[in-house]
From Swiss-Prot:
Organism: Bifidobacterium longum (strain DJO10A)
Chain's gene name: argC
Protein name according to UniProt: N-acetyl-gamma-glutamyl-phosphate reductase
UniProt-listed Pfam families: Semialdhyde_dh, Semialdhyde_dhC_1
GO MF annotation list: N-acetyl-gamma-glutamyl-phosphate reductase activity; NAD binding; NADP+ binding
Keywords: Amino-acid biosynthesis, Arginine biosynthesis, Cytoplasm, NADP, Oxidoreductase
PANTHER family: N-ACETYL-GAMMA-GLUTAMYL-PHOSPHATE REDUCTASE, CHLOROPLASTIC-RELATED, N-ACETYL-GAMMA-GLUTAMYL-PHOSPHATE REDUCTASE, CHLOROPLASTIC-RELATED-RELATED
InterPro entries (UniProt xref): AGPR_AS, AGPR_type-1, NAD(P)-bd_dom_sf, NAGSA_dehydrogenase, Semialdehyde_DH_NAD-bd
Length: 364
């Protein structure tokens, strides 16, 4: 079978670059176009020397004319840019937006955290997201919405870690919807590729940790709450039933997110043993190949998942505090962005879900 042709916009950024790295080794895709803005006319050998397969490609302008004509189009653009471009793209192409423009279902949430034009919600690209329960008690998942779709919204990286950590407890009614707290240690690539920001310079970043977007202002908050609502079997319009204290902290590492998410135990949870609570997480991720619930007593570490599409998970209880603590470690560029996007793209095209992906990290 002929390979699917792929165009990547935002090809010289971190997210676009990771998409290119994964797609270059994928057996079913052929990268035939790379597009950018400030780097137009430059060789990819300059920008992505670690991907020698791209050395002969030259960065083209990000226009519909350049992107159309390919089977798959990956948009790794700032929020606002993808939405403006998307309506001009071939309706028969599969378009994956790695940005925020098509993630949120409710315009009120978009207006509060982003502002500007609100674009239509696309099929959400988190296959493992719990979306409710079937009549037999098994979980329904977002995976079922992906086959055949032509438009995919890639989740945020912090959203991915926070959602995967806590959603089993939400789905089974083990945690209260109020007073959820998430503290995330985030690698500097999560802040994007911006040489104008002095806090991203090595002299500023090395040996320093820096909180950012604090006080309920981080733009990933409404997306996390939307996912929590779905995990509880509710609609996005009911996301306001959940409250989240969210603090991301930039740490001196290039990749990785370690999410520590805690929530008050419900009366139901208090009747369960620690082993029974752990069994809830085990059941929730049974058969989800990229989800790794670590052995009891082993906590996730970002160094173990670099370069992989896996999420390393753990859950513990603090009976004195009356809280459940859920942990997730992911590679923010792979599982948190491009890897998850390729996983969703595989499903949309009817390819093996794990094609071109690995759950084996690079360590040390």
């Amino acid at each position: 079978m002929a390979k699917y042709t792929v165009a990547v916009a935002g090809a010289t950024g971190y997210a676009g670059g990771e998409a290119l790295r994964i797609l270059a080794a994928h057996p079913d895709f052929d990268i035939t176009c790379v597009a950018g803005h400030s780097s137009v006319g430059e060789s990819m050998a300059k920008h992505m020397p670690h991907i020698p397969q791209l050395a002969n490609l030259v960065v083209e302008d990000t226009t519909p004319e350049v992107l159309n004509g390919h089977d798959v189009i990956i948009l790794a653009l700032p929020h606002g840019a993808s939405g403006k471009l998307a309506s001009q793209l071939d309706p028969n192409a599969v378009v994956v937006d790695l940005g925020a423009d098509h993630r949120l279902e409710e315009q009120a949430a978009w207006d509060e955290f982003y502002g500007g034009d609100f674009y239509e919600h696309w099929t959400y690209g988190m296959p493992e997201l719990i979306t409710g329960k079937a009549a037999d008690g098994s979980y329904t998942r977002q995976r079922a919405a992906l086959p055949g779709t032509k438009r995919i919204a890639g989740p945020g990286c912090n959203v991915t870690a926070t959602t995967l950590a806590l959603q089993p407890g939400i789905a089974e009614g083990l945690v209260e919807s109020q007073d959820i707290v998430a503290d995330l240690v985030v690698g500097y690539s999560g802040a994007g590729k911006n040489l104008k920001r002095t806090n991203l310079l090595a002299a500023e970043a090395l040996q320093s940790a820096l909180p950012y977007s604090v006080g309920g202002k981080h733009r990933h908050i409404p997306e996390i709450l939307q996912n929590f609502a779905h995990a509880a079997g509710k609609s996005a319009a009911e996301a306001s039933e959940f409250t989240l204290g969210f603090t991301p902290i930039l740490a001196p590492m290039s990749r990785g997110i370690l999410a520590t998410v805690s929530a008050r135990m419900t009366d139901k949870a208090k009747t369960l043993s620690d082993e029974e609570i752990r069994a809830v997480w085990s059941k929730a991720y049974e058969g989800q190949d990229f989800m790794v619930l670590l052995p009891e007593g082993t906590l996730p570490a970002t160094g173990n998942i670099i370069g992989s599409n896996a999420a390393h998970l753990q859950v513990v209880t603090d009976r004195k505090a009356g809280r459940i603590y859920a942990f997730a470690a992911i590679d923010n560029l792979n599982r948190g962005t491009a890897g998850q996007a390729v996983q969703s793209l595989n499903i949309a095209l009817g390819l093996p879900e794990d094609a071109g992906l690995t759950k084996i990290g690079v360590a040390p």
